[in-house]
């Protein structure tokens, strides 16, 4: 399997180590991107990705290596430390660029055959809301099977995480990896994803892009 990790930070702290720990348990074929190092642009709200083509986005070429890696991957891992109870600004800015891929707009067919994981860490709290920020995108992209893992590490860096906590993280990532590997031969969207897709198909107007094609 091919795995791509999108790190919501450029430093290699607890979130990085946990995401990488999970990835190597799934596959040896791993690509990693660090935000904002590998992509740090903000969506400018031009709406060209909705009304014309994603290729009209002023950041299309900068984003293309990550887009291609996600499209080629079997597993997408989105990882972000908690910043004020949410994802990092870099992760949010990154996800904003894929609004056009939400099921209500122009979903990418390959997403319905992928698995995705959201990982977040904090010294204390905020993992639930941070994971939701990322899970929303995985769901509305149509990613067939989704997993999440949030953990309070009670430390400001990986070296400060207790051995007891690291053992618990090791166990949790092994469990997720086993589920991903087990499910890899039978990737189908669940009822919730199928239901949302048909709602979007039946109750949304054709996009300007589709109207131009017809």
Which residues does each PLM region occupy?
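N-terminal beta1-alpha1 ligand-phosphate binding loop
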Residues: 2-25
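Residue-level recognition of beta-strand->loop/alpha-helix junctions
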Residues: 7, 34, 149-150
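A generic structural motif
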Residues: 26-31, 143-144
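A short beta-strand-loop structural module common to alpha/beta enzyme folds
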Residues: 30-38
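N-terminal beta-loop-helix "entrance" segment that forms/cooperates
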Residues: 37-55, 158-162
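Helix-loop-strand module that forms the ligand-binding subsite of alpha/beta enzymes
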Residues: 58-147
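Active-site/pore-lining binding-face segments in mid-to-C-terminal subdomains
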Residues: 137-201
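Single conserved hydrophobic/aromatic residue that forms the stacking wall/gate
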Residues: 203-214
């Amino acid at each position: 399997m091919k795995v791509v990790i999108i790190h919501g930070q450029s430093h290699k702290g607890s979130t990085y180590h946990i995401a990488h720990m999970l990835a190597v348990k799934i596959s040896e074929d791993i690509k990693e991107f660090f935000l904002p190092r590998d992509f740090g642009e903000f969506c400018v709200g031009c709406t060209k990705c909705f009304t014309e083509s994603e290729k009209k986005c002023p950041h299309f070429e900068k984003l293309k290596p990550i887009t291609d890696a996600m499209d080629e991957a079997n597993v997408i891992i989105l990882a972000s430390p908690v910043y004020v109870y949410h994802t990092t600004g870099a992760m949010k800015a990154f996800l904003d660029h894929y609004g056009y891929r939400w099921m209500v707009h122009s979903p990418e067919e390959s997403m319905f055959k992928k698995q995705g994981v959201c990982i977040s860490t904090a010294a204390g709290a905020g993992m639930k809301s941070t994971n939701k920020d990322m899970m929303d995108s995985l769901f509305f992209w149509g990613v067939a099977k989704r997993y999440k893992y949030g953990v309070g590490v009670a430390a400001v860096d990986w070296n400060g995480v207790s051995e007891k906590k690291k053992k618990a993280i090791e166990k949790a990532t092994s469990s997720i990896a086993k589920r991903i590997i087990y499910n890899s031969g039978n990737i189908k969207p669940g009822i919730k994803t199928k239901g949302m897709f048909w709602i979007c198909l039946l109750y949304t107007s054709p996009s300007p892009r589709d109207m131009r094609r017809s």
